[in-house]
C-alpha cells in the first residue's frame, strides 16, 4: 500500500515502529516511490472517506511577480528545480512556461510544478539522478496536483531523509533551489523553519 501524499518520515518510522496503524482514505491518490508499505507490516487498518485538504496558493501581488520574473531569468533549459512554499516561489512557476527539459527534485510538489509537468515543460531528461522522474517528499496543493500524481509512474515520492540529503541532491547537476526564508545571518546562512 502507498503512504500517499507525504513521506516526510513515514517510511522511515514504519521500519522501526512496534505497532503500525494506518488510515486508508479512498480519496487519497496512489503514489509510487519508497513510500510503499507491505500490508503484512500493518497491525491495524482504519478505513475512512473524506476529501483532501485544498491548499490554494495565494494570488501573487505585484511585488511577488516582479521578484519572480527576475528569478526566472536565471533558470536555464535543463535545470533541475526545487521550489519551496510561499508567494514568490509559487509565482516563479508562472514564468517558466517557455523553458524546456526541466527536472524536478524538490521537498514539496505543488500545483505550479504539476502544471509545468502537464504542459511538457518538465520531463527530467537532463537529470543525472532519477532521470525522467519527478522526485518529491510532500505533495500539497489542490486537486490539480492530487490528480496529477495519482498512479503517475513519473512521480517518485521519496523519504525526506533521502530526498533532502545533500549527498542525494548533489547528484543532479544544475540543481536550482528557490525558497522563501525568514532570517539570514551575517555569514549568509538562511533559516526558513523558525525565527529566533
Where do the language-model regions lie?
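Conserved phosphate- and dinucleotide-binding cores of soluble alpha/beta proteins
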Residues: 1-196
Amino acid at each position: 500500500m502507498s503512504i500517499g501524499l507525504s513521506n516526510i518520515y513515514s517510511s522511515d518510522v514504519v521500519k522501526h515502529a512496534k505497532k503500525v496503524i494506518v488510515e486508508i482514505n479512498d480519496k487519497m491518490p496512489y503514489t509510487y516511490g519508497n513510500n510503499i508499505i507491505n500490508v503484512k507490516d500493518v497491525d491495524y487498518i482504519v478505513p475512512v472517506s473524506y476529501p483532501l485538504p485544498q491548499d490554494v496558493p495565494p494570488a501573487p501581488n505585484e511585488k511577488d511577480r516582479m521578484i519572480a520574473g527576475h528569478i526566472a531569468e536565471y533558470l536555464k533549459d535543463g535545470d533541475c528545480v526545487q521550489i519551496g512554499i510561499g508567494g514568490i516561489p509559487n509565482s516563479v512557476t508562472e514564468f517558466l512556461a517557455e523553458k524546456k527539459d526541466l527536472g524536478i527534485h524538490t521537498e514539496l510538489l505543488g500545483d505550479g510544478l504539476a502544471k509545468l509537468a502537464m504542459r511538457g515543460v518538465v520531463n527530467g531528461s537532463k537529470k543525472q539522478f532519477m532521470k525522467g522522474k519527478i522526485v518529491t517528499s510532500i505533495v500539497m496543493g489542490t486537486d490539480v496536483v492530487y490528480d496529477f500524481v495519482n498512479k503517475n509512474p513519473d512521480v517518485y515520492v521519496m523519504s525526506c531523509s533521502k530526498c533532502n540529503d545533500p549527498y542525494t541532491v548533489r547528484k543532479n547537476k544544475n540543481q536550482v533551489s528557490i525558497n522563501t526564508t525568514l532570517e539570514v545571518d551575517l555569514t549568509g546562512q538562511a533559516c526558513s523553519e523558525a525565527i529566533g
